[in-house]
Amino acid sequence: ITVYKANMIIPQIAENLTQSGNLIIPDVCPVCGGEAKIIKSNDVESLYCMNPDCQAKKIKAFTLFVSRDAMNIDGLSEMTLEKFIGCGFIREYADIFHLDRYRNEIVTLEGFGDKSYNNLMNSVEQARHTTLPRVIYSLGIPNIGLSNAKMICKEYKNDLEKIRRATAEELSAIAGIG
């Protein structure tokens, strides 16, 4: 390959001289076996699994939901989420706030005990008292990062009903978003 320096620091590949790095793009998701498609959005092409029930997509969605910038639930790593989803403790976001129903099962899981469970429950309790921008960001809405969520909430004065009724055109008209 030939490489050049882009933006002062970041190396950028200019050319693949041997063409040895050609990959066959899969048309099937390696996790669930569902159809995989390339979707172009804002001049960027990305490969997506089209199965809405894909386990990998669910785990990534839950991982974003509990992340530091979102609901900030410490103790729910991607691996722990996989375990809890596999055990049936979590099926939707709201289930995270009712993990106390599974206390006896959770404390017997490998890597968990009373202390880990209590720390997790404290973190879940703190997440109940978060801000609306964090909740909106945590939902994983395309093109709505934390800063856009903050701008939307500011525009609509944290009125969830007004935000829910807003059209795509109205949201795009907000300064800094469109």
Where are these regions (language model features)?
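Short, surface-exposed secondary-structure boundary micro-motifs
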Residues: 3-7
